[in-house]
């Protein structure tokens, strides 16, 4: 946080910034200021305009009108190269690394020779507590480590204006604290940080000022100490929302296809002593109509387990039983045909085709079954059904998925999975980077799916989310199920955290 009064000359002033897409005003005269040595948090619902504003500041997208004042000079528009030269660096929510290059090559990519300091990079790695093998491929990193590499790229460029878009979305509490410690050191040097997040406790911990965007405008702005949580939430979501899906939404959400019907509580998916990359000896049972939470720290093996269940990774031992039949040797497509559907944690690189239309994305899994690029007259109608059910905001079915906000992209991905008519739905971090309003929609959606006797496996690093949603909870620690299933009052953040850190005598998982 800001520790001095050396803020007379702001690092950045955005004045009267306007932006329009396809006739829709997404920014309506935005004013935004960032001072030296401060963290200015930016909040807002999905589609509020946060990402568009930051892309304009970073030179990725031009504004239609308005100016950016940086270092006492005014600019109508910037390019990414010019923004970097001015000390502006945007760390995106979805890390954009070269998977086939080493970690070292990714960090140093595009740097001027004078900045190619191995010692500087090693010092930054040590300060952040990162224990990377710099010669390993970036593609081998999990989401949390890819986020750290992106932050390192910005720090290596001596950035004076650092824009962090959901930087802690995939970080553990310990990793978050390490990051905040490093940010405090940067602030002391006069760096200014724009911090985009949906996590209010973190914002109160790190931010000097808060601005809330709504519908392309600044709805609220002030010092963190002077704004109450109620003020902030009201500014983000001014319209009172229903706590559950409406009757019409539930009607639109009736799952398609001829799925085998199981009574609630019937075992649907059983894992017997499963061993694979990142996990070992995992045994559990998932029942029809329940939401089974799978908690654990980043690196505990949860995503590796999910990808193995879907056939994306090789199984080394044990059995996967779906409806009483072993599916170990089945391909991903064959598992999909039998009703096993997986929603990956990284929607942009693994879940959606960002350049394809919304209608195509929603029907992508059924396209695979009919012929990859097959099209039907029903695709637009299918998209419309999910728009009504999930409250997805878009202009036309043909627009590309990349044009949507993060929350609406996530809803398109969920619709894609539901259209495959799942018996078992594995959802990995379903609300990562999603605002309060859209998060509530997704929670009610998952409950509605489970009410149709779909078996839901919920993988989440948000322990409050696990506590809120799960009927039973397994916790993974260092690749193993660390305890028998938690139920009832034992499903609470404190107990889950204790088990996740291994501070509990391990018991054999009881199914």
From Swiss-Prot:
Membrane association type: Peripheral membrane protein
Binding site for ATP: 44-51
Keywords: ATP-binding, Cell inner membrane, Cell membrane, Membrane, Nucleotide-binding, Repeat, Translocase, Transport
Gene3D superfamilies referenced in this protein's UniProt entry, alphabetically: P-loop containing nucleotide triphosphate hydrolases
Top-tier EC class: translocase
GO cellular component terms attached to this protein's record: plasma membrane
Residue span, ABC transporter domain: 12-240, 240-503
One Gene Ontology molecular-function label: ATP binding
Primary residence: membrane
Coiled-coil segments on the chain, per record: none
InterPro entries named in the record: AAA+_ATPase, ABC_carbohydrate_import_ATPase, ABC_transporter-like_ATP-bd, ABC_transporter-like_CS, P-loop_NTPase
Subcellular location: Cell inner membrane
One Pfam family this sequence matches: ABC_tran
Reactions listed under catalytic activity: ATP + H2O + (2R,4S)-2-methyl-2,3,3,4-tetrahydroxytetrahydrofuran-[AI-2-binding protein]Side 1 = ADP + phosphate + (2R,4S)-2-methyl-2,3,3,4-tetrahydroxytetrahydrofuranSide 2 + [AI-2-binding protein]Side 1
Free-text function comment from the UniProt entry: Part of the ABC transporter complex LsrABCD involved in autoinducer 2 (AI-2) import. Responsible for energy coupling to the transport system.
Family affiliation: Belongs to the ABC transporter superfamily. AI-2 autoinducer porter (TC 3.A.1.2.8) family.
Complex and partners: The complex is composed of two ATP-binding proteins (LsrA), two transmembrane proteins (LsrC and LsrD) and a solute-binding protein (LsrB).
This protein's name: Autoinducer 2 import ATP-binding protein LsrA
